[in-house]
């Protein structure tokens, strides 16, 4: 059933749909499980609880990143097999088919195992599914973003990745 809703998810990854409720609003969330270079399974999913966003903020602060979350931000987080937060990214929707990716961070202990690569790939799949065609980032970590297909486009004031939208 999850594959019918999200046909662009890699068949090598295990996916599940988890229902969460916030007040009166019920939501289906896609959870992807992926194996990294350390041979361990990691989960990639949106936050289910406000405290997960608070923990993500702590990871950003530990990485010397000064950030302010707003109600327009959306999050995609990574967790280890003991459900400990290992990193994530956050973005905001701009107009129709554009999002601005604010920051990507992985805790030091979990770097160099391709977790950020899996997270970015998952993020691109989700954005593609949502009909997003353009992802912009600032001029930071240019090597990292270039590896993920971002190119400098002055008219967007930063680096840009153009997705092949399904719609």
Predicted regions and their residues:
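Extreme N-terminal basic, low-complexity initiation segments
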Residues: 1-9
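A conserved beta-strand-loop-helix scaffold within acyl/acetyltransferase catalytic domains
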Residues: 65-74, 80-81, 86-98, 102-105
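A short, internal acetyl-CoA/4′-phosphopantetheine-binding micro-motif in the GNAT/acyltransferase core
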Residues: 104-112
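Short amphipathic alpha-helix that is part of the acyltransferase structural core
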Residues: 26-70, 75-80, 156
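Conserved acetyl-CoA-binding loop-helix of GNAT-fold acetyltransferases
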Residues: 2, 112-125
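Conserved catalytic-core motifs of GNAT/GCN5-like acyltransferases
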Residues: 17, 151-166
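Conserved GNAT acetyl-CoA-binding A-motif
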Residues: 127-140
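Conserved active-site alpha-helix within GNAT-family acetyltransferase domains
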Residues: 2, 139-158
């Amino acid at each position: 059933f999850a594959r019918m809703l999200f046909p662009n998810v890699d068949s090598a990854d295990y996916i599940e749909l988890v229902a969460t409720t916030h007040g009166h609003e019920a939501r289906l969330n896609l959870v992807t499980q992926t194996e990294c270079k350390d041979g361990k399974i990691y989960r990639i999913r949106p936050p289910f609880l406000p405290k997960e966003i608070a923990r993500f903020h702590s990871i950003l602060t530990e990485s010397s990143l000064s950030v302010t979350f707003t109600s327009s931000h959306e999050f995609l987080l990574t967790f280890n097999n003991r459900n400990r937060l290992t990193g994530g990214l956050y973005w905001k929707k701009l107009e129709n088919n554009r999002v601005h990716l604010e920051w990507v961070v992985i805790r030091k202990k979990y770097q160099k195992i391709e977790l950020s690569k899996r997270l970015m790939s998952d993020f691109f799949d989700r954005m593609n599914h949502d009909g997003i065609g353009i992802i912009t980032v600032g001029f930071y970590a240019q090597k990292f973003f270039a590896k993920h297909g971002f190119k400098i486009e002055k008219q967007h004031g930063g680096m840009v990745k153009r997705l092949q939208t399904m719609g």
